[in-house]
Amino acid sequence: CZAADKEDDPNFFKMVEGFFDRGASIVEDKLVEGLRTRQSMEQRRHRVRGILRIIKPCNHVLSVSFPIKRDDGZWEVIEGYRAQHSHQRTPCKGGIRYSLDVSVDEVKALASLMTYKCAVVDVPFGGAKAGVKINPKNYTDEDLEKITRRFTMELAKKGFIGPGVDVPAPNMSTGEREMSWIADTYASTIGHYDINAHACVTKPGISQGGIHGRISATGRGLFGHIENFIENASYMSILGMTPGFGDKTFAVQGFGNVGLHSMRYLHRFGAKCVAVGEFDGSIWNPDGIDPKELEDYKLQHGTIMGFPKAQKLEGSILETDCDILIPAASEKQLTKANAHKVKAKIIAEGANGPTTPQADKIFLERNIMVIPDLYLNAGGVTVSAFZZKNLNHVSYGRLTFKYERDSNYHLLMSVQESLERKFGKHGGTIPVVPTAEFQDRISGASEKDIVHSGLAYTMERSARQIMRTAMKYNLGLDLRTAAYVNAIEKVFKVYNEAGLTFT
């Protein structure tokens, strides 16, 4: 019985390594065949297996303990961690979370997921993750600022933060505020001579060098990734569903940044949210829940419970009767114990690692599509890449706004004058006016437009790659393995072509 319990509640990092091993076993032969060398087949296989062993573990893990003096005069020692999984691309990239559940195992698992996530969407970062072992609700804003700034200095002392080295981002219980504190701390100390110092984080406030469109990026990306599969007639026929969002219902576990924005976009495109779950309870309404109304209620009351246009949900939100289930809370929520009770036909992993290997196996047997975390929630790191790679220090589009607008109006005027010369009678005018859609674009692309466009392109391209891989290896609905295969191929190529520094 104890062994069975352990199997259903695996070590998080071992869980990710297990998914990696599954993908590696499928792609190994192809990697061996693809090596263009004079080596024997045995030597090539040794090389491939050696590189796969290099990819798998975490390269560096930092554990720190530091004291703070709280506002009430009490002294406290804070624990924090930062894991860098891979340096095949730099800087390393990954969020910082504040939670009592933070552990070395968790940050290693999340860092490794970041490596594969970046590879899946072709973002040139290595994977990293950090965590501070606190419950932020138990601290004042002043205490949190002290903790954040001190943790930044601990990272800096060990070379675990910097624009070209390691770039944190928000995660659970952190946001623009914390990123701005980190950026200011770094820029005011060891980065004070570096023009790129504020690029030591992504998603600070706009005034601190942030980018428009980053706040909603993960949620928007989640919607776009779901859209790429839900609009695919072949996959929908396998599930016995019709393409499109119009007649679909969905439930969201977690009403944070990812849950809220994914709910907004799905609602906007015609899907109906029937249930929302948080740590203190869940609500449901078969007629639908409006995301804006629920957001306003939570901002006012600090909870979704008691929302007047829904009733309390008895039982688990993961077992809600819906078409699309979005677990956007924390890891290992879908397990062997509840996988048979899930009624959704599509599981969209908004959180990192919400599905255990045993549950994943059950979903495949039950013909349930799982759109995996390393693809689905990569919208945030994709837009972070746009922010990080903006080397000009100028908002995207700012230099071309007026020129594009004037050029568009000159084009319309030229068409109008040509028509009047050809068809106009007695000098009459033939007005040429933009359509409503063109009018929206006529001023040129704003930074947010450019970010959304780049994000959409990335989502579509990554989805096509996963679909092709799933078809190539006859994986059916096993999109997770297809995504891991893609990630492994790309990371392998970097290591193989770069070679090893010292052997």
UniProtKB/Swiss-Prot annotation:
Keywords: ATP-binding, Endoplasmic reticulum, GTP-binding, Mitochondrion, NADP, Nucleotide-binding, Oxidoreductase
Cell compartments where the protein resides: Mitochondrion; Endoplasmic reticulum
Coiled coil: none
GO MF, any single term: glutamate dehydrogenase (NAD+) activity
Chain positions recorded as GTP binding sites: 212, 216, 265, 268
Regulation: Subject to allosteric regulation. Activated by ADP. Inhibited by GTP and ATP.
The organism's place on the tree of life at top rank: Eukaryota
Reactions catalysed according to its record: L-glutamate + NAD(+) + H2O = 2-oxoglutarate + NH4(+) + NADH + H(+); L-glutamate + NADP(+) + H2O = 2-oxoglutarate + NH4(+) + NADPH + H(+)
One Pfam family per UniProt: ELFV_dehydrog_N
One GO BP annotation of this record: glutamate catabolic process
Main location: mitochondrion
SUBUNIT field: Homohexamer.
Family per record: Belongs to the Glu/Leu/Phe/Val dehydrogenases family.
Physiological role: Mitochondrial glutamate dehydrogenase that converts L-glutamate into alpha-ketoglutarate. Plays a key role in glutamine anaplerosis by producing alpha-ketoglutarate, an important intermediate in the tricarboxylic acid cycle.
PANTHER family according to UniProt: GLUTAMATE DEHYDROGENASE, GLUTAMATE DEHYDROGENASE 1, MITOCHONDRIAL
Protein name: Glutamate dehydrogenase 1, mitochondrial
Organism: Gallus gallus
